[in-house]
């Protein structure tokens, strides 16, 4: 019985092996395809190609799937793919994330007319698309992240009646976005992604005919004109994303037709008008992003009915109204709210404390007032809080230091008459332990900088500008392991420049990639940051700004150790002495400001090696000599050097005078060079004096007989000189008389 069972198993295995055996013609075609491309070894060595990695066959042993994503494939796609035309049942072809080049010809699609899924994304393909897509079966076509260019012919989709997804994101396509995709063909289309290209003109009517369309993306183009009216007829739409264009006009009240809409992103356009009153009918809305437009009026109260909202982005518009009148408590899923730079009034809405999912709040640059309540501690996930513009806040630090998840904190125009939280006021300090950015801008904080700041081991940006902080800079700040941006400008800080700041690890050593964490934060970091400084800490240049304080003494030579700093601003202090030559070690320096101090001496020639310097200012010091010639220092405006009467040379009108027939620049530059040369002449002179003095005088002091002989010798020399001079004078008188 057992013997019969084994025979049945063996027979079944033979049958299954024969059924799935690879077709030899197709095996040869696959090997031919691989041979025309360079790649990492595919390990296609076994007899049965159906067992090869990336290959799937049907029951007849014919290849249906060829999935070679991220295999390091290189070469021209068209000659290599011609052999794939023998794969008559191939329905899925994925060659994404490789380095394939060349263009797509009509023959490419003709030879693969059974394809349903074609993914060629993230390659180096280029050229224009063919006149038409000669495939009736194609359902998904992904050409994103390549180098295609030119217009997409309206005829391209004429035969693609089963197309459901078309993605050309991140190419260089231009011209109009083809609306004919819905008018003449592809009635089943569900996804259209034209974003990050060079499409221009207006969005033509026709997309309203896409009755199945769910996702429509066309952001980061050069689109203009109004939103197409018929887009509100595409009632299946779940996502509309047209950011970073030049669209204008208003959002129609007909938007309430799009009851399936979950994502609406129209940020960074020129849209205007009032927000639709019926936003509340979009019950599935999760992401509302209307930043950087010209919307005006009130935030519709009906928006509070969109209980699935996760993010609200309305920054940089002209919206107004009492924000405290809105009831946010129903938005239990709300994670981020950004109302930066509008005209909202009222107090901080306490109903936000009920939004337990909140991670980020940015209400900067509005006209809000009021206090931060202890209830904010109920927001356990709060990591980003920016309330610049919420004026006259007091006592907030004692509350916020207990927000355990807080990473970014920005406050401004507050703390009137309030002292910095002193060390004695902090018992077993455990607050702000996750803080990465601490920013107090134009506050009225007084008192000295507390040493508890040195316990913020995760802080990367410390921005305490425009307050009334006094006393010296704590040396312990130099121990902060992650600090790379320190701004203490416009305070009343005194004392000397602490050398410990020149040992800040993130300014001295490149952070190992193995220790870097995700530097993405929830919202834009700086209140008025450019797009460059969006939401990554790594995009912010390492900075040391101590300007406009009362710091005195010399700029330490150790300043040359902070190799990674991009911006160094010590202006408006009482620094004296020479400009340290070691500043030339800061090869990444882009901004150097030493103006309005008491610095003296020459401008070091070595500063000419700072190749990335685009801002330089040493005005109003006591510098002298020539401005180094033949360097980019002379490319700066004369205002960068004014206020130094003894400074000369271009770009100043004060020319350097010649010295002893030698060109003044040459002579003075020699003086600049000699300033930094080791003073060997003085050393050797001193050594000679010491050796001569002690060689003679020392021996006279030690040995009495030598001393007696020496003075006897001097007496004899004196007598002889007296005799010779007397004889010489007598002879001269006689000659004069004889004359």
Predicted segments, located by residue:
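Plant-biased, solvent-exposed loop and capping regions
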Residues: 1-739
């Amino acid at each position: 019985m057992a013997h019969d069972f084994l025979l049945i198993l063996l027979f079944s295995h033979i049958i299954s092996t024969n059924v799935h055996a690879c077709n030899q013609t197709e095996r040869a075609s696959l090997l031919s395809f691989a041979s025309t491309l360079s790649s990492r070894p595919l390990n296609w060595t076994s007899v049965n190609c159906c067992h090869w990695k990336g290959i799937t066959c049907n029951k007849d042993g014919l290849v249906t799937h060829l999935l070679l994503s991220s295999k390091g494939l290189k070469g021209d796609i068209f000659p290599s793919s011609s052999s794939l035309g023998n794969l008559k049942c191939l329905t899925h072809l994925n060659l994404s994330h490789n380095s394939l080049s060349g263009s797509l010809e009509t023959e490419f699609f003709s030879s693969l007319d059974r394809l349903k899924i074609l993914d060629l994304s993230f390659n180096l393909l280029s050229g224009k698309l063919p006149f038409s897509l000669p495939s009736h079966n194609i359902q998904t076509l992904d050409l994103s992240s390549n180098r295609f260019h030119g217009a997409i012919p309206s005829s391209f989709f004429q035969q693609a009646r089963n197309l459901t997804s078309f993605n050309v994101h991140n190419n260089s396509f231009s011209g109009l976005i083809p609306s004919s995709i819905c008018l003449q063909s592809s009635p089943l289309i569900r996804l259209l992604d034209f974003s990050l290209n060079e499409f221009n003109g207006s969005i033509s009517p026709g997309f309203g005919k896409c009755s199945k369309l769910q996702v429509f993306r066309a952001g980061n183009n050069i689109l203009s004109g109004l939103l197409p009216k018929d887009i509100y007829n595409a009632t299946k739409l779940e996502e509309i994303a047209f950011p970073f264009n030049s669209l204008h006009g208003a959002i129609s009240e007909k938007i309430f037709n799009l009851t399936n809409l979950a994502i609406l992103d129209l940020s960074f356009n020129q849209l205007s008008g009032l927000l639709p009153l019926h936003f509340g009918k979009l019950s599935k809305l999760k992401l509302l992003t209307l930043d950087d437009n010209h919307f005006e009026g009130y935030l519709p109260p009906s928006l509070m009915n969109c209980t699935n909202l996760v993010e609200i982005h309305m920054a940089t518009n002209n919206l107004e109204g009492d924000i405290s009148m809105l009831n946010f408590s129903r938005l239990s899923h709300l994670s981020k709210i950004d109302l930066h730079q509008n005209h909202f009034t009222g107090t901080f809405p306490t109903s936000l404390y009920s939004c337990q999912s909140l991670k980020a709040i940015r209400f900067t640059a509005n006209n809000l007032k009021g206090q931060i309540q202890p209830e904010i501690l109920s927001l356990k996930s709060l990591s980003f809080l920016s309330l610049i513009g919420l004026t006259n806040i007091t006592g907030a630090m004692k509350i916020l230091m207990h927000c355990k998840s807080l990473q970014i904190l920005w406050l401004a125009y507050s703390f009137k008459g309030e002292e910095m939280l002193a060390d004695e006021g902090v018992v077993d300090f455990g607050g702000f332990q996750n803080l990465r950015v601490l920013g107090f801008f134009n506050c009225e904080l007084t008192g000295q900088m507390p040493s508890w700041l040195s316990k913020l081991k995760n802080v990367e940006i410390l921005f305490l500008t425009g307050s009334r902080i006094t006393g010296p800079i704590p040396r312990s700040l130099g121990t902060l392991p992650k600090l790379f941006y320190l701004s203490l400008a416009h305070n009343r800080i005194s004392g000397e420049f602490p050398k410990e700041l020149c040992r800040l690890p993130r300014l001295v050593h490149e952070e190992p990639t193995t220790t870097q964490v995700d530097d993405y934060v929830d919202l834009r970091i700086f209140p008025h940051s450019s797009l460059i400084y969006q939401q990554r800490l790594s995009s912010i240049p390492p900075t040391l700004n101590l300007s406009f304080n009362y710091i005195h003494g010399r700029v330490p030579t150790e300043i040359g150790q902070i190799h990674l700093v991009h911006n160094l601003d010590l202006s408006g202090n009482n620094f004296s002495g020479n400009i340290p030559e070691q500043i030339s070690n800061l090869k990444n320096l882009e901004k150097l400001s030493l103006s309005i101090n008491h610095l003296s001496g020459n401008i070091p020639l070595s500063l000419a090696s700072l190749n990335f310097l685009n801002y330089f200012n040493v005005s109003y010091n006591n510098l002298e000599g020539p401005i180094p010639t033949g360097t980019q220092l002379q490319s700066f405006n004369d205002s960068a050097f004014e206020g130094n009467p003894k400074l000369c040379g271009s770009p100043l009108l004060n020319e350097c005078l010649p010295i002893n027939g030698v060109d003044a620049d040459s002579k003075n530059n020699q003086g600049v060079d000699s300033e930094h040369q080791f003073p060997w002449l003085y050393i050797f002179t001193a050594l000679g004096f010491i050796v001569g003095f002690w060689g003679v005088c020392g021996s006279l002091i030690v040995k009495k007989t030598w001393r007696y002989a020496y003075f006897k010798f001097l007496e004899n020399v004196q007598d002889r000189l007296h005799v010779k001079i007397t004889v010489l004078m007598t002879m001269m008188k006689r000659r004069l008389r004889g004359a």
